């Protein structure tokens, strides 16, 4: 194995530690702190000349701080003559700002972030479950977008008490993801929630396509933000006779009123991964369980360093 160096910012320290343990490689010695005026201070405290460097840093909230930490760390490592720098971004912030809506005067911020990282000197990106896969094309360097679904599916398969399960897509846009999960769950049935607003200023209506009566519903998505839509979807499923509702998602964004929404009796359990650290408030509601992607990301790092196939991990 080439001379791999692992470094981490302050966004996901526990995930970075788990990845380093699985690779049997200690995290690199770096100072990532703040000056008295709040500016980011980075210093690499060991030799990285010619090394294959991986920086582990989600750009989750506080998004701008974590993004700038990553940018400054890349610059510090580039100036220290690192041989190759891979940005390992388990959760890629700003991914939902991937296009202009019709003629709206808005930026495509995902492209701005990609340009920023490319200009500062990254050689490759490793990320997980991009909200929009076309973001890979925003970069001028290779991007490996791995999937958290195998870890989620493995957990679902371990649920021995599931009764007549059905996979549910929370919207039309998530049908491809839900279909893939359903296929891997022994070709189980699938339902779709079609959200419609009949007319302006009228509450959104949830139409459920599929029979969920007396079944355990498994809602799958790439991320959960405020949880408002998820809560309404769970309520609609329960009204249609669903027995239990389990929500599975890779990224636990959990902003705004997420704790209040996910405490709803309509949702029996929420299962997420550790691409974003769980706050104490979210831990306190008692129904959120966290799975780790450390083994998968560690294997991806090993394969990248050894110039092996990443897609073979998911065949």
UniProtKB/Swiss-Prot annotation:
PROSITE patterns: PRPP_SYNTHASE
Annotated cofactor note: Binds 2 Mg(2+) ions per subunit.
Residues given in the record as Mg(2+) 1 binding sites: 131
Location relative to the cell: Cytoplasm
GO CC annotation: cytoplasm; ribose phosphate diphosphokinase complex
Chief place of localization: cytoplasm
EC number: 2.7.6.1
Gene3D superfamilies the UniProt entry points to: 3.40.50.2020
Pathway involvement of the protein, from the record: Metabolic intermediate biosynthesis; 5-phospho-alpha-D-ribose 1-diphosphate biosynthesis; 5-phospho-alpha-D-ribose 1-diphosphate from D-ribose 5-phosphate (route I): step 1/1
Keyword Chloroplast: no
Superkingdom of source: Bacteria
Binding residues annotated for Mg(2+) 2, in chain numbering: 171
InterPro entries: PRib_PP_synth_CS, Pribosyltran_N, PRibTrfase_dom, PRTase-like, Rib-P_diPkinase, Rib-P_diPkinase_bac
Keyword annotations of the record: ATP-binding, Cytoplasm, Kinase, Magnesium, Metal-binding, Nucleotide biosynthesis, Nucleotide-binding, Transferase
Cofactor(s), names only, from the UniProt record: Mg(2+)
Molecular-function GO terms, alphabetical: ATP binding; kinase activity; magnesium ion binding; ribose phosphate diphosphokinase activity
Binding locations of ATP: 37-39, 96-97
Similarity comment text for this entry: Belongs to the ribose-phosphate pyrophosphokinase family. Class I subfamily.
HAMAP family attached to this UniProt entry: RibP_PPkinase_B
Protein known as: Ribose-phosphate pyrophosphokinase
Species whose genome carries this gene: Haemophilus influenzae (strain ATCC 51907 / DSM 11121 / KW20 / Rd)
Gene: prs
């Amino acid at each position: 194995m080439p001379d791999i160096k692992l470094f981490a910012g302050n966004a996901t320290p526990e995930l970075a530690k788990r990845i380093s343990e699985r690779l049997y490689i200690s995290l690199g010695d770096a100072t990532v702190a703040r000056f008295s005026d709040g500016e980011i201070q980075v210093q690499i405290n060991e030799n990285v000349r010619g090394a294959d460097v991986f920086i582990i840093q989600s750009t989750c909230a506080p998004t701008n701080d974590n993004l700038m930490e990553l940018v400054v760390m890349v610059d510090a490592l580039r100036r220290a003559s690192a041989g190759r720098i891979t940005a390992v971004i388990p959760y890629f912030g700003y991914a939902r700002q991937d296009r202009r809506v019709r003629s709206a005067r808005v930026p495509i911020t995902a492209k701005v972030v990609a340009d920023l990282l490319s200009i500062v000197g990254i050689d490759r990106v490793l990320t997980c479950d991009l909200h929009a896969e076309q973001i890979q094309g925003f970069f001028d360097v290779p991007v490996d977008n791995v999937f958290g679904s195998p870890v989620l599916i493995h957990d679902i398969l371990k649920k021995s008490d599931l009764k007549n399960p059905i996979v549910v897509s929370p919207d039309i846009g998530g049908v491809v993801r839900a279909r893939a999960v359903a296929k891997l769950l022994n070709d189980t049935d699938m339902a779709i929630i079609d959200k419609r607003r009949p007319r302006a200023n009228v509450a959104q209506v949830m139409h459920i396509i599929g029979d969920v009566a007396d079944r355990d519903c498994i809602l799958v998505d790439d991320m959960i933000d405020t949880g408002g839509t998820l809560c309404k979807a769970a309520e609609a499923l329960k009204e249609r006779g669903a027995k239990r509702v389990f929500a599975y998602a890779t990224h636990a964004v959990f902003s705004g009123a997420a704790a209040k929404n996910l405490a709803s009796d309509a949702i029996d359990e929420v299962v997420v991964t550790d691409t974003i650290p769980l706050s104490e408030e979210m831990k306190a509601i008692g129904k959120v369980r966290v799975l780790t992607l450390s083994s998968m990301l560690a294997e991806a790092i090993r394969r990248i360093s050894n110039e092996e196939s990443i897609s073979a991990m998911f065949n």
